[in-house]
């Protein structure tokens, strides 16, 4: 009997020890990039990475020219209030380092302009904080304003949505905790290997939800990550949504700092007989590393020219 117990115990440890070892190794690997000196030199230098992109935006069944600016910067963030800390030295354990993405999109549809912006707050140490803490998204055009905010809580994401459309109205609801399409961009910059692949549950991008007038909900998509067929130095990450057929493909550099080169988004644009499947495209234009919050004098407008933002 003792011999049998010994064998059972031995088999148990032979199985469980490699499991914990692989878990520990995975944890260490997930922190290797963000703990590297290259990461610290690039993201903790007191400046932001600002990249402009040339845009072809699908809207109303047509393609419209515009531009996008992606602003990536690290910040100290409050876990409880989910806002940027004014005095992180006094946070007493409430602080978490995040990589913030501000995505600004502007394009004209005939006489009037769309001005859209997202903010995404993703913890740098995703092994400790695996979910993005907060997303905000706003849209302004001549018809009116809309605003959506997602906050992570213990049950998932609390969503608050405000719109001038009667059918969309002002709403508060909850979504289960799943990966956000909006956080794919920050995951790429932090650690591309953290990108989910295969059949996944995902919450679509807030900006895409606004443009398609589709309420945010957890959806099923097929996600893939692979080498760009035209350039071995680049990677492609692609999403294909089951229900809508909408696709999103992000192309980024294979090596640190994993710069986002371009993206494409294909979906049904327009209403009624004018609806057609079109592809929004954004291609990288200029890059600037700057403490832009200090560059606010009239003479600093030259920096907009360096980014190719003359409009």
Where are the regions a protein language model picked out?
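Surface-exposed beta-loop interaction hotspot
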Residues: 151-200
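N-terminal Sec signal peptide cleavage junction
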Residues: 20-23
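Generic secretory/membrane-interface signal
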Residues: 14, 176, 230-232
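Bacterial N-terminal signal peptides
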Residues: 9-18
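Bacterial N-terminal signal peptides that target proteins for export
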Residues: 1-8
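Acidic, serine/threonine-rich low-complexity disordered tracts
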Residues: 26-154, 193-311
């Amino acid at each position: 009997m003792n011999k049998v117990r010994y064998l059972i115990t031995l088999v148990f440890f032979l199985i469980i020890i490699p499991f914990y070892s692989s878990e520990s190794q995975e944890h260490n690997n997930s922190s290797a990039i963000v703990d590297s000196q290259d990461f610290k030199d690039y993201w903790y230098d007191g400046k932001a990475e600002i990249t402009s992109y040339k845009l072809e935006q699908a809207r109303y069944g047509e393609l419209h020219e515009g531009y996008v600016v992606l602003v990536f910067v690290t910040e100290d963030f409050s876990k409880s209030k989910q806002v940027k800390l004014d005095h992180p030295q006094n946070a007493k354990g409430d602080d978490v380092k995040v990589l913030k993405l501000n995505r600004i999109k502007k394009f004209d549809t005939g006489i009037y302009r769309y001005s859209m912006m997202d903010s995404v707050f993703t913890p740098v140490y995703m092994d400790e904080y695996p979910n993005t803490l907060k997303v905000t998204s706003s849209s302004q055009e001549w018809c009116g304003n809309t605003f959506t905010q997602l906050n992570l809580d213990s049950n998932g994401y609390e969503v608050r949505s405000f719109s001038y459309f009667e059918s969309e109205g002002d709403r508060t609801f909850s979504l289960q905790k799943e990966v956000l399409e909006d956080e794919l961009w920050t995951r790429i910059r932090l650690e591309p290997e953290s990108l989910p692949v295969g059949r996944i549950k995902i919450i679509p991008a807030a900006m895409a939800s606004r443009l398609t007038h589709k309420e945010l909900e957890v959806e099923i998509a097929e996600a893939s990550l692979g080498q760009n067929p035209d350039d071995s130095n680049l990677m492609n990450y692609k999403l294909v949504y089951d229900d809508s057929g909408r696709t999103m493909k992000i192309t980024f550099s294979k090596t640190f700092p994993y710069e986002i080169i371009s993206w494409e988004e294909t979906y049904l644009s327009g209403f009624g007989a004018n609806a057609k499947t079109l592809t929004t495209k954004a291609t990288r234009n200029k890059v600037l590393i700057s403490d832009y919050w200090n560059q606010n004098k009239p003479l600093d407008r030259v920096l907009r020219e360096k980014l190719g933002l003359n409009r």
